[in-house]
């Protein structure tokens, strides 16, 4: 191949991720790359929660259009922003090693969630984070918070919030780890499906490119992500419901932990299951939780 064009969003984190992939392709596959940046609807519409304006696909559509029109060969995403069902003709071609998957508690005044006073204002637009936070501390006030990492941090620094919740991985990648006041234990806030994993999206028809990209694939990330996404797909979960899933690999055994909650955090169901087939494991755990009333909880 002469050159690979990578479609990317314009935020600092998106460009960090895209440059990470670009450097790996150039050094390990010896193929030159260029980056083509673009704004997505998810970047433009910031005054409404994602679940009200179309969900995670809003961060991807423009990049996928660029690939379909031959303006880009691949796109790079945070896996947690990728819906469980891709548009026809697209696939996830490479999973990168996972960064810390935990949620991060960020505050200028308080050291942890436990330190927050009653009625403290916490910023997050994630229903998953909101539900788990309210389940743990029902005396907090959760307010929506959209925008890139820098925008969210500046709103915290301006005093709009007592604390905000972000993904640890993004802060670590942007060398902002010192802003993390507490890595929230997964027992309190189970991560989003795929959180901490960067993925490459490509067209299924591009066999030559897929074969090359596969050489960059991290087997462990691929296996745990497949389990988490299979669980999410079986539940048909998007950003309009409070769902979390996190898998760990030990030898060939996958331990999958999952959570569904009502949006107010009053009802929560957590389960875990161990297996060696990621797709089967994700589906079985989802079916077990459906039998225990997962849909009723998500609807409430």
Swiss-Prot record:
One GO term under biological process is:
protoporphyrinogen IX biosynthetic process
| Pfam families in the cross-refs | Porphobil_deam, Porphobil_deamC
> What pathway is it annotated to?
Porphyrin-containing compound metabolism; protoporphyrin-IX biosynthesis; coproporphyrinogen-III from 5-aminolevulinate: step 2/4
Q: What is this enzyme's EC?
A: 2.5.1.61
Where is it found, in Gene Ontology cellular component terms?
cytoplasm
Give the molecular function GO annotations.
Answer: hydroxymethylbilane synthase activity
Q: Which positions does the record annotate as the modified residue S-(dipyrrolylmethanemethyl)cysteine?
A: 239
Q: Which family does it belong to?
A: Belongs to the HMBS family.
Q: What does this protein do?
A: Tetrapolymerization of the monopyrrole PBG into the hydroxymethylbilane pre-uroporphyrinogen in several discrete steps.
Another remark in the UniProt entry says: The porphobilinogen subunits are added to the dipyrromethane group.
Record note on quaternary structure: Monomer.
Entry protein name: Porphobilinogen deaminase
Give the source species.
Answer: Francisella tularensis subsp. tularensis (strain WY96-3418)
């Amino acid at each position: 191949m002469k050159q690979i064009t990578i479609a990317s969003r314009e935020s600092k984190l998106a460009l960090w991720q895209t440059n990470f992939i670009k450097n790996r392709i150039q050094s390990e596959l010896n193929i030159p790359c260029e980056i083509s940046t673009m704004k997505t609807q998810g970047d433009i519409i910031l005054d409404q929660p994602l679940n009200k304006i179309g969900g995670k696909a809003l961060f991807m559509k423009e990049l996928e259009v660029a690939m379909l029109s031959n303006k880009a060969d691949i796109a790079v995403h945070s896996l947690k922003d990728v819906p469980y069902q891709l548009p026809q003709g697209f696939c996830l071609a490479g999973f990168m090693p996972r960064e810390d998957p935990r949620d991060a508690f960020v505050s200028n005044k308080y050291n942890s969630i436990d330190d927050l006073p009653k009625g403290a204002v916490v910023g997050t637009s994630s229903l998953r984070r909101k539900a788990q936070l309210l389940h743990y501390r029902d005396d907090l006030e959760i307010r929506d918070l959209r925008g890139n990492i820098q925008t969210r941090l500046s709103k915290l620094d301006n005093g709009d919030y007592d604390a905000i919740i972000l993904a640890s991985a993004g802060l670590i990648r942007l060398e902002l780890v010192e802003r993390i006041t507490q890595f929230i234990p997964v027992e309190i806030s189970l991560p989003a499906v795929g959180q901490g994993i960067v993925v490459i999206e490509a067209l299924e028809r591009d066999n030559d490119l897929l074969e090359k990209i596969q050489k960059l694939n991290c087997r462990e990330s691929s296996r745990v992500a497949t389990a988490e996404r299979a669980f999410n797909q079986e539940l048909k979960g998007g950003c309009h419901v409070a769902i979390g899933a996190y898998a760990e690999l030990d030898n060939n055994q996958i331990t999958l932990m999952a959570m569904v909650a009502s949006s107010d955090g009053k009802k929560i169901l957590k389960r875990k299951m161990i297996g060696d087939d990621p797709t089967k494991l994700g589906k079985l755990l989802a079916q077990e939780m459906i039998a225990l009333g997962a849909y009723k909880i998500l609807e409430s």
